Curated annotation (Swiss-Prot):
PANTHER family: EC PROTEIN HOMOLOG (PTHR48198), METALLOTHIONEIN-LIKE PROTEIN 4A-RELATED (PTHR48198:SF1). It comes from Oryza sativa subsp. japonica. This is Class II metallothionein-like protein 1A. Metallothioneins have a high content of cysteine residues that bind various heavy metals. It comes from the Eukaryota. GO terms for molecular function: zinc ion binding. The gene is MT21A.
Length: 87
């Protein structure tokens, strides 16, 4: 899998180190691809921050773990509170 706009890379790729993927297979961890930014391909590294150590799936969106302040569209809503019941 290559880097794309979901991985923080410009499309079409302008070339250079800004859009280069590397496989962590070199470190013995199997064939797992990451962007040069260090995030997994297919996961937009939202600039608003990400959960450093997620405790559950409540903040996870398509393999991304977004911080509480994240409102970017690629991460989606991370609000975990249930909607208020209407009476």
């Amino acid at each position: 899998m290559g880097c794309d706009d979901k991985c923080g890379c410009a499309v079409p790729c302008p070339g250079g180190t800004g859009c280069r993927c590397a496989s962590s297979a070199r470190s013995g961890g199997g064939d797992h691809t990451t962007c040069s930014c260090g995030d997994h391909c297919g996961c937009n590294p939202c600039r608003c921050g990400r959960e450093s150590q997620p405790t559950g799936r409540e903040n996870r969106r398509a393999g991304c773990s977004c911080g509480d302040s994240c409102t970017c569209a690629s991460c989606g809503s991370t609000t975990t509170t249930a909607p208020a019941a209407t009476t």
